[in-house]
Curated annotation (Swiss-Prot):
Protein name as catalogued: NAD(P)H-quinone oxidoreductase subunit J, chloroplastic
Species: Spinacia oleracea
Name of the gene this protein is made from: ndhJ
Subcellular location(s) of the protein: Plastid, Chloroplast thylakoid membrane
Subunit note: NDH is composed of at least 16 different subunits, 5 of which are encoded in the nucleus.
Keywords per UniProt: Chloroplast, Membrane, NAD, NADP, Plastid, Plastoquinone, Quinone, Thylakoid, Translocase, Transport
Length: 158
């Protein structure tokens, strides 16, 4: 079944794939990485002015990595805001997705965390660097194929 936003995107010739609805009835769409930035700008102009959360996950060992965006359309006088979930998949070898920092400023730390834990590079992000792990850390700890080092010495911060 096609949702309201998916029908609107089809009407305007914007490429996407509908993934149905989640358990709360929120429409979920898949966008290709090369189309994501332009569609993000269009969604912002359409009224999705709030990035509620951004996260990432490893689909399967050796498989794709996913960056997930939960967007909300908040309007004055509307009791129930409209929500949508966007999934952007990237290959494991060179995971690159356009950053939406310049569309929603709240993507800043969230994209940095996804980079730090999964190694997804967000193109045009102004401060894309590790946020949780030390700069000297090797690898991406939340990937399913990550091998935990036997020993890691953290340098004294003082």
């Amino acid at each position: 079944m096609q949702g309201r936003l998916s029908a609107w995107l089809v009407k305007h010739g914007l490429v996407h794939r509908s993934l149905g609805f989640d358990y709360q009835g929120i429409e979920t769409l898949q966008i290709k990485p090369e189309d994501w930035h332009s569609i993000a700008v269009i969604l912002y102009v359409y009224g999705y002015n709030y990035l509620r959360s951004q996260c990432a996950y490893d689909v399967a060992p050796g498989g794709l990595l996913a960056s997930v965006y939960h967007l909300t359309r908040i309007e004055y006088g509307v009791d129930q805001p409209e929500e949508v979930c966007i999934k952007v998949f990237a290959p494991r070898r060179n995971p690159r997705i356009p950053s939406v920092f310049w569309v929603w400023k709240s993507a800043d730390f969230q994209e940095r965390e996804s980079y730090d834990m999964f190694g997804i590079s967000y193109d045009n992000h102004p401060r894309l660097k590790r946020i949780l792990m030390p700069e000297s850390w090797i690898g991406w700890p939340l990937r399913k194929d990550y091998i935990v080092p036997n020993f890691y010495e953290i340098q004294d911060a003082y």
